[in-house]
Amino acid sequence: MTMGRDIDDLPKNDANHTALTPLWFLERAALVHPSRISVVHGSQHYTWHQTHQRCRRLASALSNLSIGLGHTVGVLAPNIPALYEAHFGIPMAGAVLNTINIRLSASRIAFLLAHSSAAAVIVDQELFSLLEESLKICSEKSKSFKPPMLVVVGDESCHPNDLRHALAKGVIEYEKFLESGDPEFKWKPPQDEWQSIALGYTSGTTASPKGVVLHHRGAYLMSLSGALNWGMKEGAVYLWTLPMFHCNGWCYPWTLAALCGTNICLRKVTAKAIYEAIAEYKVTHFCAAPVVLNSIVNSSPEEAILPLPHVVHVNTAGSAPPPSVIAAMSELGFRVTHTYGLSETYGPSTVCTWKPEWESLPIEKLAQLSARQGVRYIGLEGLEVMNTKTMQPVPADGATVGEIVMRGNAVMKGYLKNPKANKEAFANGWFHSGDLAVKHPDGYIEIKDRSKDIIISGAENISSVEVENALYSHPAILDASVVARPDEKWGESPCAFVTLKPGVDSSNEQRLVEDIVKFCRSKMPAYSVPKSVVFGPLPKTATGKTQKHLLREKAKEMGPVRKSKL
């Protein structure tokens, strides 16, 4: 009887327990591979020893200004070394990192700065004017607003006038700020792994953005999960096509340190730049939304450097990738892994794990299987597709729709200053994603739609994702998104917004519309066929997600379909 108590009563102490934090990965990388290249950005090349010192300098410089535990530091920058260093240097000072979407409006950034009570902001020189405008809005809205300390990052690839403008305002330059710090700074790991490491914000498409708070433990576990689920090896060469400011780059800044790999920064993402980086740096991995994959597939012969020198692994998420795009990427020599997640789950938290028996399948069937969202990450303890009324799992029949819910270490601490949203998100002991899916007999889940994106036409529920997948397989279509448009007869009907491939003759739009509708009729039930087709570029977020809320507004402004027929 006492044996059990003796076993369980052994206490934690400094020798056998340390709070988990991904910051330790940087320490190890600098120790094991000090001379290996850690970060590349144009002519800038840093080793792991140098990156380690630069991050400690950043932590020291912040600490010298009494910025640390309880403070938030914002970073407004594209994929540059300073943003990578911020993922270590800011939490090394004990502060919380808030990476800010560079494509937001000044008013939206002003909201984030005020809501997060930013003590400091590190800003890229090209974005300084945007930040100035945001700070002006903050000051006008609240007399008690305390402006954050500003640091501007210079970049040789940008026009020098932007940097001169910031320096003329008395803002300190990033490299000089680092010089004020100690390269041997003795940073302190968190006492509690529940301590916050990062703050990110949801897109806020229908209301104010919600502040997603992440902890050190989750960041540590999901960094390693990202490597294990993707089969990444030590020394991986990773191309930053995914914005680091989005969900902390899906935790890959920390992953690359754990693997002692090399980060190739890409300030602007184009198919040509991706191909060139693969050829020059021997890139092994990159992450990208389906829209980026689409640009690779449809790149011109002048842009593409083919055949690829080796297999390049691609992690795609952000929206459901059309099977046709996955198939085309595979034919080019890319190995695509589909993942799924949210800001609230540290980025991807499910993965469509590859199975050996798939090797012999036709590429079209393989693409269909790979387009599913898959199974839970190693770092996620619970994943289900639930009937939200009964909170019971739906049958694994590939047909019954439920909501994706999660629980475990990969789920956020909660929303900052938003108890109502926290209560709703964590109802019944699960995190509710708002995504609707089915579970297949093999246990793999597949998203059918966001709950708000389901189109209800008459008595039929139409998945916008399924209609979009059909549109993507049309030879003239480059990009597509489907939303509900008011319909006098059916309440709602599908409205397709379409971007045509370069070179497609669009002089006769009516003929194109008829061709697309005819094509869709051969692929889906009549009630799912788009009743409206609109041509033009689609509005995108920073990570390539289509901004459906804007398209829904546009469809509503178009007025109801008056002669819709099934």
Language-model features: where?
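Gly/Ser/Thr-rich phosphate-binding loop
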Residues: 175-176, 258, 283-288, 297-368, ...
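Conserved AMP-binding/adenylate-forming core of the ANL superfamily
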Residues: 17-18, 23, 35-88, 105-110, ...
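AMP-binding/adenylate-forming catalytic core of the ANL superfamily
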Residues: 75, 104, 121-123, 286, ...
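Conserved pre-ATP/AMP-binding loop-to-beta segment of ANL
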Residues: 34-37, 151-158, 165-201, 207-208, ...
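Structural core segment of the AMP-binding/adenylate-forming
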Residues: 64-65, 88, 92-179, 502-504
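Conserved AMP-binding A3 loop
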Residues: 47-49, 197-221
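Conserved structural elements of the adenylate-forming
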Residues: 52-60, 179-184, 212-233, 241-245, ...
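Conserved AMP-binding/adenylation subdomain of ANL enzymes
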Residues: 220-237, 245-285, 295, 299-300, ...
